Amino acid sequence: MRFVVRLFPEISIKSAPVRKRWTKMLTDNLRLMAKRIHPTARVNKEWDRIEVTAKVDDPVVEGQLIDMLARTPGIANFSHVQTHPFESLHDIYELVQASWGDQLKGKTFCVRVKRTGNHDFTSTEVERYVGGGLNQNNPTGGVKLKDPDVSIGLEVKDDQVYLVTKKYQGLGGFPMGTQESVLSLISGGYDSTVASFQMIKRGLRTHYCFFNLGGREHELAVKEIAFFLWNRFGSTHRVRFISVPFEGVVGEILQKVGPSNMGVVLKRMMLRAGERIAERGGIEAMVTGEAVAQVSSQTIPNLSVIDSVTDMMVLRPLIVMDKRDIIDISRKIGAEEFSAAVPEYCGVISVKPSAKVNRAKLEAEEEKFDFSILEHALENAVVQSIDEVMDDAQELAEVELVSELPVSAKVIDIRHHTEQELRPLTVEGREVLEIPFYQLSTAYAELDKAVNYYLFCDKGVMSGLHARHLLDAGYTNVGVYRP
């Protein structure tokens, strides 16, 4: 199988050295991910495109490669193509007729051709010859150059013709690793999740900083989201997850700060802490999911007061986006179910928030704050590599792990529905239930308590985490299946 990948247009207009460097980065990223899918996968770079091939005829591998290409930053679009040698225009027509003739009945169509190499014909001549032949020899609805029912794409390159069987939309953006690193202050809600995704899409290596206000379960939920974003969109580059215990900071704010200023002061404390953590990691910018006037702490006056505590750049990719559009992006990238289950803790300390705080009064209240508590939180911050972020042996110690299923046990595939569709799980002689992780806690209550269920995911990380959740909830009939 063969795919032709087109660069995101903003890459194509860069200077020759930059374009060459960024195209190489995208090629390296694709090569790394393609090899994970199949050992025969090859990625070859050319000036205006990248070709991905695999010496295997397997629809599962094909689906995995399509999914990988669709979620890789830096790609405008990509096409599944078939290559054939040719000697004449009529050879090209016959190839197209064999592939497309049966699909044109009663439909309008057009033929689009790109050509490179030395030939005695032009791209337009190929379009006319092939299009005319198709129209004469098939019961079509006629040629229509604008908005046809079927658009047939082909590329003539030297002595080969590339027939496009299907075209796919890419993610856009810049290749991961072409830009600098940023630190995303992630809470797990829609806003910070989508903001993190937008930075990854733009090619920035995005590290995660989580201020824990809600205890262990909140932290594990946010780790799931960060791991999902990294694993799906940025796994070619390692990043870190930093968890900062912020309960003490919140407690101090509740005691020392008036109700109208609490939300803004909390954000100021987060930026102070985030700046310190970023500097430790050599990171030059922080990222937040704030949008103008979405809540009272996010008005222009209040954002100005919040930003005044740091000299570091604070990036806000969602600053003028509507909440509906943010949720739509979350849904599109597969993160909506994660964020919908994460409680928003920042708002609980703002009883009567002010949309325009008095800076002098706020700073006077902040002077009462015991900053040793903030220092203590920073000293106790936990730094983990993102690929190990949920692989905590102590937390998973009580979970039964099996490679062979006990008699009468059933398997629950808890992977995201897109992964279930791409790589269906089959276990000979056993029933496999497909219950995505975000539905598991609700669905598990309805299952037969006399049956033992073993959770499955690709790496055993998510399954171990959710098995632990169920054990904590009082269920004893749960384990992890690692074949």
UniProtKB/Swiss-Prot annotation:
Keywords: ATP-binding, Cytoplasm, Disulfide bond, Nucleotide-binding, Redox-active center, RNA-binding, Thiamine biosynthesis, Transferase, tRNA-binding
Record-level GO cellular component terms: cytosol
Catalytic residues identified in the record: 457
Principal subcellular localisation of the protein: cytoplasm
EC number: 2.8.1.4
Disulfide bonds: 346-457
Matching SUPFAM superfamilies: Adenine nucleotide alpha hydrolases-like (SSF52402), Rhodanese/Cell cycle control phosphatase (SSF52821), THUMP domain-like (SSF143437)
Domain Rhodanese: 405-483
Similarity section: Belongs to the ThiI family.
Name by which UniProt lists this protein: tRNA sulfurtransferase
Species: Saccharophagus degradans (strain 2-40 / ATCC 43961 / DSM 17024)
